[in-house]
Amino acid sequence: MSGNTLGRLFRLTTYGESHGAGLGGVIDGCPAGIALDEAVIQRELDLRRPGGNSASTTRQEPDRVRLLSGVFEGVTTGTPIAFHVENVDQRSRDYGEIARLYRPGHADFTYDAKFGVRDYRGGGRASGRETLSRVAGGAIAQALLARHGIAVRAFTVELGGVPADLVDVAGAQQRPFFSPDPDVVEAWEDMVRTVKGEGDTLGGIVQVEATGVPAGLGEPVFDKLDAVLAYALMSVGAVKGVEVGAGFEAARMHGSDNNDPIVPSGFFTNHAGGILGGISNGETIVLRAAVKPIPSIAQEQITIDRDGKPSALFIAGRHDISAIPRIVPVLKAMTALVLADMLLMQRRMATPQP
C-alpha cells in the first residue's frame, strides 16, 4: 500500500488502523533546534480526541503520545522524529456482523476491490482515527512555522446547513464545535440532538486560515501552493470539496469584483485567498473544506455482501454524529504540513543575498 507519505522536504509518513495496536508516524526533514516535546503534540491531539463533545463517538481514547526519536532536551535534533499512540478502547466485537457486508458511504467496497482483503473493524486504515497521526505531525509542523512567524487556525463556519457568523474567530478554539459565533452554538447543539435521535448524521464546512505566510511559497506549475493544499485537505476521508479564497463564488463574480486591488500596504481585498499563480502573495491564506455527513447511521440500509447478494444492514458500534468538530484540528494540521514543506522548499531555492 503506497500513498502513506506527504511532502517532499518536510515529510510525514503515517501508520496504523482504528482497531490495531496503535497509530503513529515519522516526520523526516524537520530542521534541528526547533522547540518540541510531547506536551506540544498532546495539546493538538486533545483537540481531536473522541468523547469530548455532543457530536462525537463515546469511544474513550486518551490518545497519549510518545516521542520515540528525533528530540533531545526539548529540541529537535534534525533526525527523523517518530511518535506513537496506543489504541486502548477498541470494541471490535461491534463489527462482527459486517465482516462480509459493505457499508454504504464507507470504503469497504473499494478497499476490497483494490486489495482483495480488508480490516472491517472500525474501517481499518480508512477510519477517521487514522487522522490522529496527521494531527501529531501537524503539531510538529506548527512548531516549525511558529519559528518563522506563521500561524494556522481553523474553525467551523457551517454545520448541517446552518451557518455561523465570524463574530469571534479568536475564541473559536474554546467554544463547542470550534464555532466563531457564540450565538449559533445552541442551535447546533439542538440540531445534533435531533439528528442523533433520528439515527442520522450531519456534515458541514470548515474554514482554515494561515497568517504570517511570506510571499513566494509555492512551486508552479504542478506543485502550486493552492493545488497542494487542496490535495492535502482532500486526502482527509470526510472532505468532498475545497475552496480557496472566494472559491466557487468567484465563478459568479465579474473580473472587476474578483480582482484584489494592490495598494502600497498590500492587497485591498483578498478574494484570491492569499495565493496568486500558485504562489503565496503575503496575505492571509483562506481555505474552506466541505465535510460530508458521517456514513455510519443508525438506520437500516440497503447493501450487498462480498458475493454480490442483496442484504440489509444496521450498523452497530460507537460513531460520531458529525466529523465536526474533530476534523477541525485535522484540517489545520494538513495545512501546516504543506506550509512547512513549502517553506523549506522556498528557503532551499532562495537566491543568496550578498
UniProtKB/Swiss-Prot annotation:
Textual note on the cofactor: Reduced FMN (FMNH(2)).
Family matches, as CDD domains: Chorismate_synthase (cd07304)
Keywords: Amino-acid biosynthesis, Aromatic amino acid biosynthesis, FAD, Flavoprotein, FMN, Lyase, NADP
Cofactor: FMNH2
Domain of life from the UniProt record: Bacteria
Binding-site residues, NADP(+): 48
GO biological process: amino acid biosynthetic process; aromatic amino acid family biosynthetic process; chorismate biosynthetic process
Entry-linked Pfam families: Chorismate_synt
InterPro entries, A to Z: Chorismate_synth, Chorismate_synth_AroC_sf, Chorismate_synthase_CS
Record pathway: Metabolic intermediate biosynthesis; chorismate biosynthesis; chorismate from D-erythrose 4-phosphate and phosphoenolpyruvate: step 7/7
Any one GO cellular component localisation term in the record: cytosol
Catalytic reaction(s) noted: 5-O-(1-carboxyvinyl)-3-phosphoshikimate = chorismate + phosphate
Keyword 4Fe-4S: no
EC code: 4.2.3.5
Function as written in the Swiss-Prot or TrEMBL entry: This reaction introduces a second double bond into the aromatic ring system.
Subunit annotation: Homotetramer.
Alphabetized HAMAP family for the sequence: Chorismate_synth (MF_00300)
PANTHER family the record matches: CHORISMATE SYNTHASE
Protein family membership: Belongs to the chorismate synthase family.
The protein, known as: Chorismate synthase
Lineage of the organism: Bacteria, Pseudomonadati, Thermodesulfobacteriota, Desulfovibrionia, Desulfovibrionales
